[in-house]
Regions:
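Charged (Asp/Glu and Lys/Arg) segments that form or flank catalytic channels of large polymer-
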Residues: 2-232
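Terminal interaction-prone segments of large eukaryotic proteins
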Residues: 178, 182-502
Length: 502
């Protein structure tokens, strides 16, 4: 069945609902590429199925099994020769012919050199799919795995800290941990323990592993603060007499990576020209090579060169964050299964399915409009405050609901106590959320506003002064974003500004 032409008829309503589907892509990590497209991945001499002229050179990074990971030294998109879908099918079918004629050892080397593994029922060997599936068009890299899962960020930050230690600043891990501890993240991020990634014996573990070991979400949360630390602290070490050497090349390489990450994140909220992303990626790769050479560039560095093409094809950059979080549900129920039997998998599947059906049956399961999350009737004290602030009549009290959390766009929510940016005339202003409420069904947020003291746009760093005893109420959809902030000793507030608002 070709769903792009015939669709599928679903039995809803009197006449039913017909859905058509066109395959957009497979968002995958490297391991999934091996299962679906039979790529040999990082262990192959030719580690990218999409590039015909890219082969490995031995790296200095040793994997846990003792084998050398591969490095990539092609740093420009224009220097790559792109493979076609027909090229991939020819390779798969060439292996199909050779498997019956080549000795096992020779066939293994052939697969290694071509970057593809032969499997009897491989997707690329299914002739029926030739007219429906274009592998090159639907082959996608997941930027989350590329950058944050033993990826580009983990290696680059590790190498930067090692460079700082070599020039004489031996306590950089401890100082960085203390610096992170001064910052606060939006409630949804759970950033209170991020400083622990670099504290205590974690330093030894990172250095033994030759990369920073942390969860992908934690790595993403750290990018902004780490960038400011590099700009304000590491780039000034020699000038302040703390080191004899200089590590500016390494610092600028990390900052170039941070720019790439900021562009990727911003692409989900604002239009981003693919060329802009490609330019930033190529700049980072060149600066990384200047700082540390190509020997540390694993295939995930090469993945970055393909991201702009994915943005061009789909108009956005998909990632696996939400898919990875889905692992929590089966883990939650699998932990409680004590009787390992032939039906334990079925039991687990039933538990997970019931869990998801329970979530889907909730009335707000697909509620993405602006408004309160799990709102409830406001207390009398809250009613009195809002009636006074909004100059309402006493009859409005019955319509007032409140919550500590509210959705301000289809993409995000914010909590009471979060520092936010909100629309103010032609620009934006910062403030802290005091309460979220609804009055006559209209979502409203009470804000303690800040006045701008200083804004360093290139750094994305700003200083604000809280306005004392002056709260304002805004419609919740006027909130632009939640931000990372730090409360300074003099009462001012340091705020990191997202790239799209600089």
């Amino acid at each position: 069945m070709n769903l792009a032409l015939t669709g599928v008829l679903l039995p809803f309503g009197d006449s039913g609902v017909r859905l058509w589907a066109k395959l957009g892509g497979f968002i995958q990590d490297g391991g999934a590429h091996k299962f679906v497209w039979h790529s040999r991945g990082d262990g192959a001499s030719k580690f990218c199925l999409l590039c015909k002229n890219l082969f490995d050179q031995e790296s200095e990074i040793v994997d846990e099994d003792g084998s050398n990971l591969l490095s990539c030294d092609v740093l420009k998109w224009d220097e790559l020769v792109q493979a076609s879908s027909n090229d991939l099918r020819k390779t798969a079918r060439y292996l199909e012919r050779k498997v019956v004629t080549e000795p096992p050892a020779a066939f293994l080397l052939l697969q290694q050199s071509l970057g593809m593994t032969y499997h009897k029922h491989a997707l690329l060997l299914n002739r029926y799919l030739d007219d429906y599936v274009s592998p090159v068009e639907v082959y996608l890299h997941d930027w989350m795995h590329a950058i944050f899962v033993d990826g580009v960020f983990n290696f680059t930050l590790y190498l930067l800290l090692e460079s700082v230690i070599r020039i004489g600043f031996a306590d950089v891990y401890e100082v960085f941990s203390s610096y992170i501890a001064n910052w606060k993240w939006p409630h949804r991020v759970q950033g209170a323990n991020l400083h622990g990634i670099f504290a205590g014996d974690r330093e030894k573990k990172h250095r033994a592993a030759n990369h920073i070991k942390c969860q992908a979400s934690d790595g993403l949360s750290l990018v902004g603060v780490a960038s400011l630390f590099v700009r304000k602290v590491l780039l000034n070490l020699q000038r302040r007499g703390l080191t004899e050497g200089d590590c500016s090349a390494e610092c600028y390489a990390f900052l170039a990576l941070a720019e790439v990450v900021e562009l990727i994140v911003a692409s989900s909220r604002i239009p981003l020209p693919p060329k802009t992303l490609l330019t930033a990626v190529e700049k980072f790769l060149q600066l990384f090579k200047t700082a540390w050479g190509c020997c540390w560039m694993t295939p995930k560095f090469h993945w970055l060169l393909h991201l702009h093409d994915q943005l061009r094809k789909l108009g956005n950059l998909l990632n696996c964050f939400c898919l990875e979080r889905k692992h929590r549900v089966p883990k939650r129920y699998a932990t409680d299964i004590a009787n390992v039997s032939k039906k334990n998998s079925k039991s687990l599947l039933m538990e997970v399915t019931s869990h998801h059906l329970g979530q889907l049956s909730q009335h707000d399961a697909f509620a993405f409009e602006v408004g309160l999350v799990r709102g409830s009737k406001a207390s009398k004290r809250t009613q009195q405050v809002l009636i006074a602030e909004l100059e309402l009549g006493p009859e409005a009290a019955a319509t007032i609901k409140h919550s500590i959390e509210s959705r301000f766009s289809p993409l995000a929510t914010c909590h009471k106590g979060d520092v936010i940016l909100y629309k103010d005339d032609a620009g934006f202003r910062a403030g802290k959320v005091l309460i979220h409420c609804e009055v006559h069904g209209l979502p409203i947020s009470m804000i303690s506003p800040f006045n701008l003291h200083k804004f360093d746009a290139p750094c994305g760093h700003s200083i604000w002064t809280p306005v004392q005893d002056q709260n304002i109420c805004i419609e919740t959809d006027q909130i632009l974003d939640t931000v990372v902030y730090s409360e300074l000793p003099d009462g001012k507030v340091s705020v990191l500004i997202p790239s799209e608002f600089r």
